[in-house]
C-alpha cells in the first residue's frame, strides 16, 4: 500500500483497532506493546519509505528490525527496503556502520544482503577487515555492528575480528563508542582526560559489543560487562543510562535488556518494568525517549524503534520471521 494511503487508513481505523486492546494498562502483554509500537513506527514512515529518527538510513534499517520483531507491517517493510535499496544504489551507505545496519535489516526481512542495491554488502564489509582484525578504521560501535551483520549473514567472525573487540574493552567493563582502550593514556572508563576525548564507556556500545561477542565470539571478557550494566542502572526510574548522570532512557534500557537476552541471562528485576513505563499510552503506541521530571516525555520514533525488539527480549541479529507474523494495522498518536 502507498505510504500516504496507509497513513490515512491509520487515522480511520485506529479507534476500531484499539477496541481489541485490554481496558487496563496492567492487562497489556508485551506482544501487544510491540504491536502497538510497530504500528506507531509505521505511521511515521515517509512516502519514500524512510523512517528517519537519528539518521535516515540507520533508523530505517532499525525500523525494519522492529517490524520483523513484532511481526506484520509487511507493506512498511517493503517500502523501507525500497528506500534502503535506493540509498545503497546511490552509494549513500558506504561506511562500515551503515552497511552493517542495512545488512541486518535485509537479512531479517528475508532478503539477500549479498545482492542488494547492486552490491554484495557482506563482501563489502569483509573486504574492510585488516590484519589486526579491526574492520576498516571504524569506531568500536561500528565494529560491533559489523560483527552482528556478518553473523546475521551466516558467518562466524574470525578470532582476529572478535579479538579486536575483546581487546577494545575498557577496564571498567564497558566499551567506549569511538576508540578502543589505550592502556598508556586512558583511565578505567577509556577517558584520556583531554578536551578532544568526548566518549567514555557507555551502555549502548557495550550492549552491541556483548550481543556481537555472545553470538559468535572466540575468547573471554577481560572484565564482566554485566557488572558494568549493574553499575549503570538508574536508581530513580529503574532503567539504564547511556552513561552516569544521564538518567533512564528507552534506547539504553532496551539495548541492555537485549544484551542480557543474548547471553541467556534474566533481565535484572524491574528492568523490563522500567522499559514498559516509558510507553505510557498504549493507544499511541510510541515510547518516550526519557523522562521530563517524573513523567515520560512525548512519543519518540527513535526510542520506539529501539524498544520493540527489547520488550520481546529479542537480541540482535534477528532472523526472518522473528515476530508473530500476523499482519498489523498502523496507528498514530
Please give the residue ranges for each predicted region:
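Bacterial N-terminal signal peptides
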Residues: 12-21
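Internal amphipathic alpha-helical repeat/solenoid segments
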Residues: 41-56, 80-94, 125, 129
